[in-house]
Regions:
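Metallo-beta-lactamase
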Residues: 14-120, 125-131, 168-234, 255-262
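Acidic/histidine-rich helix-loop elements
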Residues: 107-124, 207-215, 265-274, 301
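Active-site-proximal loop/helix segments of hydrolase catalytic cores
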Residues: 151, 208-287
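Conserved small/polar residues in nucleotide/adenosyl-binding loops
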Residues: 312-313
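Active-site metal-binding motif and surrounding structural segment of the metallo-beta-lactamase
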Residues: 117-167, 252-258
């Protein structure tokens, strides 16, 4: 009888202690991967990719050249003003009178693991790395090759020894393996203060991978910056979701939002992970942003929408 009572005591004690353990966030799955806040997965089967590849054969995917404005280097090097410079694709130089931030830096010719194949840049960067002012922080939204470019981040880390790389959960190891040590990974809603600027990593609807077998093993998201003078959010890549309303609820409205408007066709394969221009406007309204800049267009031909349409939309 005593043995039975002892067993029951140990069983219920173990159950109670398990219940009191902190549970992982809902977007942390048991297999070590991550999920969107609403659980919506990105599904791209081999059959779908082959169908898309076949359909693209009959489409006009020619590039569209447009005139580039020269950066205002006087303002950029002054550092006493709030200046946001679109360098191309989703790369921005953001200066808020406190720190200089570079988002998703991509300065090379291809968005690809290969230097001789893959989507080729058809518009040069608005600035070259050697023309940049001092950079305090580099943010990476997710691991795709058009957002995390090895050669670009390596050159930046070599030029600016003290630059801090802020990356999604799971990506810190990649940077350390590449010899970049000053890196900090954040989960959704984690914040870090750099000088007088609060930087928060927020959820959006997307996915991650750098190879065939690492789907969603690292997180993805948006970067929100706020100090006394200004607030800015860089959404990265994202489909339309309620995440924008939650960002507004938790972090407040922003002065400026960098919103992706490209890489959205065909909708039957891109809808979950990329907004079209109409959805981009909806995200702008959800965020209650004062101003917005369209990004993720005019640099690489990644999907099927005409570039001329994006030029008009932006």
């Amino acid at each position: 009888m005593r043995l039975v009572l002892l067993f029951l005591f140990l069983f219920y004690a173990a159950s109670a202690s398990t219940e009191n353990l902190p549970q992982p966030p809902a977007h942390h799955l048991s297999d070590g991967t991550y999920a969107n806040t609403n659980g919506v997965p990105y599904e791209s089967s081999f059959k779908k990719l082959m169908q898309w590849s076949w359909e693209r054969r009959s489409k006009d995917l020619s590039t569209f050249k447009f005139e580039m404005e020269k950066p205002n280097y006087k303002e950029i090097y002054n550092n006493d003003n709030i200046v946001t410079t679109w360098i191309g694709h989703e790369t921005f130089l953001y200066q808020n009178k406190d720190i200089n931030v570079l988002t998703d830096p991509h300065f090379t010719d291809r968005a690809s693991p290969l230097s001789f194949a893959g989507p080729k840049r058809y518009m040069p960067p608005g600035m070259e790395i050697e023309d940049l002012p001092n950079i305090d922080v580099v943010t990476i939204s997710h691991s795709h090759y058009d957002h995390l470019d090895y050669r670009s981040v390596k050159l930046i880390s070599e030029k600016y020894e003290d630059v801090l790389f802020l990356v999604p959960l799971g990506l810190e190891e990649w940077f350390i393996n590449k010899g970049i040590k000053n890196v900090r990974e954040l989960d959704w809603w984690d914040s870090i203060k750099v000088s007088d600027t609060e930087i928060t990593f927020a959820p959006v609807q997307h996915w991650s991978a750098r190879g065939l077998f690492d789907r969603n093993e690292t997180l993805w998201g948006a970067w929100h910056f706020k100090n006394y003078y200004h607030s800015f959010i860089h959404l990265g890549d994202t489909g339309y979701s309620d995440d924008f309303k939650e960002i507004r609820k938790r972090l407040g409205s922003v002065d400026l939002a960098a919103i992706p408007i490209g890489a959205y066709e065909p909708r039957w394969i891109m809808e979950v992970s990329h907004m079209n221009p109409e959805e981009a406007v909806m995200s702008f309204l959800d965020l209650e942003a004062s101003k917005a800049i369209g990004m993720s267009w005019g640099t690489f031909i990644l999907t099927d929408e005409p570039v001329s349409c994006l030029l008009y939309t932006s």
